[in-house]
Amino acid sequence: MANQKIRIRLKAFDYRLIDQSAQEIVETAKRTGAVVRGPVPLPTRKQRFDILRSPHVNKASRDQLEIRTHLRLMDIVDPTDKTVDALMKLDLPAGVDVEIKLQ
């Protein structure tokens, strides 16, 4: 796998889970001899929703909800076959979405 890099993008609602997963990926990649760039925290996406409290009247009375999506980006430069195998075997928490691209 000469002159290739792996780009990993993590997405989660809980920042603690995403930081823990990023740390596990960095440790695994460094253990196999690859060079890791990151994790780079990307801007947090905030979705806001306004919901009526009452089903009938009181239009002015509303609940405001927010969902925050945290993102991290990592590049693994010059990965070996051992690096790819170790990343495939890595067990990450269920709340973390992982996108892996070979470039």
Curated annotation (Swiss-Prot):
The keyword Glycoprotein does not apply. InterPro entries: Ribosomal_uS10, Ribosomal_uS10_CS, Ribosomal_uS10_dom, Ribosomal_uS10_dom_sf. Gene3D superfamilies: Ribosomal protein S10 domain (3.30.70.600). GO terms for molecular function: structural constituent of ribosome; tRNA binding. Keywords: Ribonucleoprotein, Ribosomal protein. GO terms for cellular component: ribonucleoprotein complex; ribosome. One of its GO terms (biological process) is translation. It holds the Pfam family Ribosomal_S10. It comes from the Bacteria. Involved in the binding of tRNA to the ribosomes. Part of the 30S ribosomal subunit. Belongs to the universal ribosomal protein uS10 family. PANTHER family: 30S RIBOSOMAL PROTEIN S10 FAMILY MEMBER. This is Small ribosomal subunit protein uS10. It comes from Dechloromonas aromatica (strain RCB). The gene is rpsJ.
